[in-house]
């Protein structure tokens, strides 16, 4: 017998457990105290494990079964209803899922290509200050462009990365902060993460929680960049870094440029997410350090919960049930009778016992050995 399998019930279990995990992640992402106490990487790890649980719906044979017979029975009745003469509802839903996935993949692919095309055809201008900073420590496979058509600093790329800067009046230190932030996005491979998120959203386009989780993961990536930078900054530099965020936000709010799409790019600020900006300030100004032992324990518990989730499956409990056999007396020979109770042989009876009051209620069936 195989140790594991994939069934409709393992898919259902994965979907439900993913949604539960996603809701917990979203709720805790909005709690600054939780992030300060446990770190943003715990939420990112939880998000990764939640997605793995969703796309690997393994059904273990020794998993604990949670009986959903009462839910499954009417659901099954609904799914096997026919639409017309040949198409069942479940077939229609699978067809709709497939068409939707193809449509969303096409939409995200085309909009991402258009986004990158527009960025690569910007009207660029020189910026000596930024170019000097760039030449000091940037990797040669990173391309920098400055353009008045860019609304906020942003970055994208895999093998060769591109950083785009707006034509803002900023000091060398402010440009340095922005440059360092965008370089962090490159080092942490955030474009690749965003691309995977787009694929998963296209695959599970019918699940509204996916869109909310994607938005929160985007914000977590910004918080992670801030955390990486701030841990090496002095208090004075942290304050200047926050002042730079505010200055870029003010510049963006006074700009007449339309908000650009951000399917693959990661930007320095999000002018429409006030709560995120406030959270960035609270985290950078926080003076408490993470407890490494507690953080490691939280990681272990998270991984343990992920592994243990495979030992739970939601499905109708298929216990073997047998209908009880008949209770009767079988006449096998002139002086031999056999008593069967619930279909199971009990004992032999004599003719006197058979006709006694005790056994008179049982039917006598003529038979043979």
Language model features: what each stretch is:
Residues 2-67, 80-313:
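Membrane-embedded and juxtamembrane structural elements of multi-pass membrane proteins
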Residues 65-75:
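Extracytoplasmic catalytic-loop and juxtamembrane helix elements of membrane-embedded
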Residues 312-369:
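Short linear regulatory motifs and low-complexity interaction segments
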């Amino acid at each position: 017998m195989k140790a594991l399998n994939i069934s409709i019930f393992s898919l259902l279990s994965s979907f439900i457990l993913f949604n539960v995990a996603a809701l917990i992640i979203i709720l805790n992402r909005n709690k600054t105290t939780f992030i300060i106490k446990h770190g943003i990487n715990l939420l990112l790890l939880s998000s990764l494990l939640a997605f793995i649980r969703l796309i690997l719906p393994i059904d273990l044979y020794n998993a604990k079964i949670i009986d959903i017979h009462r839910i499954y029975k009417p659901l099954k009745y609904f799914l096997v209803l026919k639409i017309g003469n040949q198409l069942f509802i479940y077939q229609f839903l699978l067809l709709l899922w497939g068409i939707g996935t193809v449509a969303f993949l096409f939409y995200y692919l085309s909009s991402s290509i258009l986004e990158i095309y527009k960025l690569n055809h910007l009207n660029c201008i020189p910026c000596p200050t930024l170019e000097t900073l760039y030449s000091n420590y940037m990797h040669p496979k990173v391309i920098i462009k400055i353009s008045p058509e860019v609304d906020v600093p942003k970055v994208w790329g895999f093998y060769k990365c591109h950083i785009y800067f707006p034509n803002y009046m900023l000091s060398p230190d402010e440009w340095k902060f922005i440059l360092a932030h965008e370089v962090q996005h490159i080092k942490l491979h955030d474009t690749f993460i965003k691309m995977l998120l787009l694929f998963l959203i296209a695959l599970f386009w019918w699940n509204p929680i996916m869109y909310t989780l994607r938005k929160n993961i985007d914000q977590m990536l910004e918080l992670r960049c801030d955390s990486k930078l701030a841990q090496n900054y002095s208090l004075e530099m942290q304050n200047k870094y926050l002042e730079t965020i505010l200055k870029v936000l003010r510049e963006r709010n006074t700009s007449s440029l339309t908000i650009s799409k951000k399917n693959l790019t990661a930007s320095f600020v999000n002018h429409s997410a006030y709560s995120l900006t406030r959270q960035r300030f609270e985290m950078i100004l926080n003076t408490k350090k993470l407890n490494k032992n507690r953080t490691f324990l939280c990681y272990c518990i998270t991984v343990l919960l992920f592994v243990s989730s495979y030992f739970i499956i939601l499905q109708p409990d298929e216990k073997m049930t047998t209908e009880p056999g008949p209770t009767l007396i079988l006449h096998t020979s002139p002086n031999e009778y056999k008593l069967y109770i619930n279909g199971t042989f009990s004992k032999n009876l004599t003719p006197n016992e058979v006709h006694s009051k005790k056994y008179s209620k049982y039917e006598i069936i003529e038979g043979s050995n």
